[in-house]
Curated annotation (Swiss-Prot):
A zinc finger (unnamed) spans 3-34. NCBIfam families: transcriptional regulator NrdR. Residues 49-139 form the ATP-cone domain. Keywords: ATP-binding, DNA-binding, Metal-binding, Nucleotide-binding, Repressor, Transcription, Transcription regulation, Zinc, Zinc-finger. It comes from the Bacteria. The gene is nrdR. GO terms for molecular function: ATP binding; DNA binding; zinc ion binding. The keyword Ribonucleoprotein does not apply. Its cofactor is Zn(2+). This is Transcriptional repressor NrdR. Negatively regulates transcription of bacterial ribonucleotide reductase nrd genes and operons by binding to NrdR-boxes. Pfam families: ATP-cone (PF03477), Zn_ribbon_NrdR (PF22811). Belongs to the NrdR family.
Length: 150
């Protein structure tokens, strides 16, 4: 690997460790020319499926968009960032586990709702109201009654 300090192409690995719950390898490297040390992270590049929207259009997986939607539902709620990241991680794992090239937006939405139900019930109702396009108060009531039965 090229040294970021002197651009020399020969470096050696001093230390390797697993990071991010085993999803990455963290490597400490040293340049054979200038002696500077730096850290690299190695991640397997796995293609996530495309998302098929309700209108039939297809979009590449966009974790930022999903995170933004979840955070909007969780706005001003007492949920730790780590819990949100863990939920996103589980959704990503489920996407990979399908083995499919495409996943419907409705399936993805159901997974998000499952995660939000566990994180925060208010956020779950918020997300469900947008995702399922609630028209009136009775739709809210049905979702809330469903939560109370659990």
């Amino acid at each position: 690997m090229r040294c970021p300090y002197c651009q020399f192409e020969d470096t050696r690995v001093i230390d390797s460790r697993l990071a991010s719950e085993g999803e990455q390898v963290r490597r400490r490297r040293e340049c054979n020319r200038c002696g500077e040390r730096f850290t690299t992270y190695e991640t397997a590049e796995l293609a996530l499926p495309r998302i098929v929207k309700r209108d039939g259009t297809r979009e590449p997986w966009d974790e930022g968009k999903l995170r933004q939607g979840m955070l909007r539902a969780l706005e001003k709620r007492p949920v730790a960032t780590e819990a949100v990241e863990a939920a996103l991680f589980r959704i990503r794992q489920r996407l990979r586990a399908t083995g499919e090239r495409e996943v419907s937006a409705s399936q993805l939405g159901e997974w998000v709702m499952e995660e939000l139900r566990e994180l925060d019930q208010v956020a779950y109702v918020r997300f469900a109201s947008v995702y399922r396009s609630f028209e009136d108060v009775s739709a809210f009531r049905e979702v809330i009654e469903g939560l109370e039965k659990r």
